């Protein structure tokens, strides 16, 4: 699909304005997957805070400046990248923030969830805002690239949402990026969490999960296939989650009679990593954009919006459930081409009224309303999410 898209270094992300605003108030922690665009966003923000200084813990010269606290006191914005790898990083940040020059802003970026690196030390409570940078969504591509919803979804299903493969004009370059990314991801980033001899097993797990998207995650089966314990399999999945590679969608069991599914379902942040047919890729894309929607509502509004699934003992299933606190707000079923809602979706729509119920369809001729269930085109419906 030929689209005239801006390159990844020149395009503002949808979060840019929000992060810029928060930098004037508190320390900002910006996390997200490797190559999701954090460094590019940081450098774009630096242009509005000149003079600014960027320091990366993985660069030896920068690491020395960080440990000696020898950065420029005149910098209006300090960017610390991958600082969570530093021992006692929370204590360091608290001291740096409390002792900063007047009016100096601070942005901390990292490719892992900060809460994963739990450690003793000073609390940052009350000093920071958190933002999570996701790959592109339908809405963000429309807002930043000026494409239609249909064009945006088609590109995301073809290339995934990471800036470089998504925005490049060359499909070959996108494929080369994907192959290298899948190889390097586990080999390089996982070493921050595990030992060298575990990397091969984690790579095998990563490859297995690419083929099990949307299925209940039975850790005992994975453990058996990999010849490891279930406890180790759980830890490995948690590592992949912490690096924003995969995420689990947990079952919603409140007020659902005969609820069965204890196992979560597994999805990838980047649909381009999924191995499966068009239906599986569409389901993963919807899951990833729903997670982005939830994280945006949490980060921007402080709302307790969460993503779940429902499956009962008769194996009736609703693909996705959005909840705010203890209240279901949305029921979402995903189909590639089937426009007819199931009896179970109708039943759950009545059960959770006034929650919105929708069947989003990838290839839909005509939107429709069947009782309380809306049948909507996937591209248009996804364009209406919060982010």
Tell what function each PLM region has.
Residues 2-6, 132-312:
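Interdomain hinge/linker elements that couple catalytic modules in large macromolecular machines
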Residues 109-114, 119, 135-136, 361-363:
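A short beta-strand-to-loop transition that corresponds to the Sensor-1 phosphate-sensing loop
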Residues 65, 84-93, 118-119:
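Conserved ATPase-coupling elements of RecA-like P-loop NTPase cores
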Residues 114-129, 145-146:
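Short regulatory helix/loop adjacent to the ATP-binding pocket of P-loop NTPases
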Residues 90-114, 122:
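Conserved catalytic/switch belt of AAA+ P-loop NTPases
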Residues 61-78:
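Conserved alpha-helical scaffold flanking the Walker A/P-loop in AAA+ ATPase domains
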Residues 73-89:
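Conserved P-loop NTPase "ATPase switch" module shared by AAA+ and STAND
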Residues 1-35, 39-53, 57, 62, ...:
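A cross-kingdom feature that marks ATP-driven nucleic-acid transaction machinery
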């Amino acid at each position: 699909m030929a689209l005239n898209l801006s390159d990844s270094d020149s395009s503002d992300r949808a979060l840019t304005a929000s992060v810029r605003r928060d930098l004037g108030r508190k320390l900002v922690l910006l996390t997200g997957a490797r190559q999701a665009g954090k460094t590019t966003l940081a450098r774009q923000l630096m242009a509005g805070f000149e003079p600014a200084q960027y320091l990366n813990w993985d660069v030896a010269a920068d690491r020395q400046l960080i440990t000696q606290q020898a950065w420029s006191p005149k910098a209006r914005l300090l960017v610390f990248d991958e600082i969570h790898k530093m021992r006692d990083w929370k204590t360091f940040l608290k001291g740096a923030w409390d002792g900063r020059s007047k009016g100096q802003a601070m942005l901390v970026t990292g490719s892992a969830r900060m809460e994963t690196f739990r450690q003793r030390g000073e609390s940052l409570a009350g000093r920071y805002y958190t933002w999570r940078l996701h790959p592109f969504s339908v809405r963000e591509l429309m807002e930043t690239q000026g494409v239609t919803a249909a064009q945006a979804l088609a590109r995301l299903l073809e290339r995934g949402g990471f800036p470089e493969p998504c925005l490049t004009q060359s499909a070959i370059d996108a494929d080369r990026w994907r192959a290298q990314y899948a190889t390097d991801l586990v080999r390089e980033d996982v070493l921050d969490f595990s030992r060298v001899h575990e990397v091969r097993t984690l790579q095998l797990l990563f490859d297995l999960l690419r083929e099990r998207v949307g299925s209940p995650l039975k850790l005992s089966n994975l453990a058996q296939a990999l010849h490891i314990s279930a406890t180790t399999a759980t830890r490995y999945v948690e590592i992949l989650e912490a690096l924003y590679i995969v995420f689990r969608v947990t079952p919603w069991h409140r007020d659902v009679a005969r609820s069965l599914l204890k196992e979560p379902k597994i999805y990838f942040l980047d649909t381009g990593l999924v191995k499966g047919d068009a239906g599986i890729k569409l389901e993963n894309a919807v899951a990833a954009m729903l997670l982005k929607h939830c994280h945006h509502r949490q980060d921007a509004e402080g709302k307790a919006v969460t993503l779940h699934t429902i499956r009962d003992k008769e194996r009736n299933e609703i693909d996705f459930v959005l909840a705010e606190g203890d209240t279901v707000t949305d029921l979402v079923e995903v189909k590639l081409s089937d426009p007819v809602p199931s009896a179970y979706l109708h039943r759950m729509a009545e059960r959770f009224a006034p929650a919105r119920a929708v069947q989003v369809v990838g290839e839909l001729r005509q939107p429709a309303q069947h009782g309380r269930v809306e049948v909507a085109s996937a591209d248009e419906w996804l364009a209406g999410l919060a982010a």
